[in-house]
Amino acid sequence: MLKGFYINDVQDRNSGGFQDDEDTNKRLRMISGWLTSGKNRPSLLLYGGVGNGKTTMAHAIASTIDALRDSARQVEKSKAYGYTLTPEEKEEYCLLRKFGTLPSPKIITAQKLAWMAKNDEETYRKVAEAKFLIIDDLGCEPVSVKNYGTEITPVTDVIYQRYETMSTTIVTTNLDKKDICNLYGLRVSDRIEEAYDSIAFTKDSYRTKR
């Protein structure tokens, strides 16, 4: 399911076509494992160079979770009408229930999040409190902004807040872990290390292959 959504998103973005290589398929397997295993950390960090599929993958994950949630609703309706699940369906249903209570993921760039903190506090708070949030392009935003003369750190504050509640968060970034530590500090780096599973995107940019 995830691979299908990823292929569609690649085609929609006109990024040179889907590269069906081992590196891409390995990442798809790792992310599928994060989605299906109950033993993984609640959040996910997708990091690596520019233009190698991180944002596209984040959108594919969001589409996959939407589909899983819709499937969970259909199963609930079937059970209400007396349908008995097969052993295979019961196993799948455990996965569906994991995401069945989550709303559609909110997807926002880190730069937009920083802008909201300064110009639209109400929306900023709502986004920060979302049950499932995808922050795209961490590191492209100003680390701190001034709101009525008060200096705030919008993305750092969101990461702290979501760490405290262990809310599901996906972050994409061109920064490596050392860069994250240097830019945001050790406390943010430690929280990401503790609460996020990490998947590196190491291929060259797809944008140069058009």
Q: What is the predicted function of each stretch?
A:
Residues 82-87, 94-163:
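Conserved nucleotide-sensing/catalytic segment adjacent to the nucleotide-binding pocket
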Residues 69-80:
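Internal, charge-rich low-complexity segments
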Residues 56-70, 85-92:
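P-loop NTPase Walker A phosphate-binding motif
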Residues 41-58:
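Walker A/P-loop nucleotide-binding motif
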Residues 1-40, 198-199, 203-210:
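A short, basic N-terminal segment
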